[in-house]
Amino acid sequence: VVAAVAVKRAVWTHWNLMAEAAKQTMDLRFATTEDREAVLGLVVDAAQARSVVLTPPELAVSPVRFQREDGTSRFRPRHGEKYSSIAVLEAEGRLLARAEKVTAPTVSVGVAGRACGNGKVSLTDQQRRAGESICRSGRQVDLLVGPAGAGKTTTMRALRAVWSGEHGWGSVVGLAPSAAAAQALGDDLGVACENTSKWLHEYDRGRTELRRGQLVIVDEATLADTVTLDRPTG
């Protein structure tokens, strides 16, 4: 249950665990509804015990008149604790550390400036600065964030052209959370893109690999779980 929930979110609650437990036990038959609820409770209790509690403990004990029947404080929402896991927290730590490291390949200042401003891809000043920043940052993990319509796709297209010009054809790898999204990303960038889960499956079996100098673009990264993002960036 914890592993399944962690694929969908980095932080979860009692109710997330309850929903996943109900989903996984849906095909099991019980004599009564009470039996099903009792088993679900046991599964959720075990899942919470395997999780890391993020919600800080209460600093003081509430008076009895402010406690529920189970002894919890009425000043806190019932089952309002937030949870995560060691695997997710460690993956998050590695991602943050990589965002601080500036040992990754770059594009030379002259090439980045010419390619982002020479008209191959029409860019606004903001898009050009974003593209140049990523090309020259040297960070192992970098971000391009913006609202819909801000021109992220156009910036990524210019970034792909710049990077390929410096590091050669095939030096840009595109990943996306679904096959349809990967197809759309590939059409936008002009390179072959893969579903992230499929790419990792192929990577685990030695059917694909990353080499130094390659730029991995993960589109819609907020839709990917933390552990999945940790793997190709390592």
Ranges and model annotations:
Residues 1-234:
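Conserved ATP-binding/catalytic motifs of P-loop helicase motor domains
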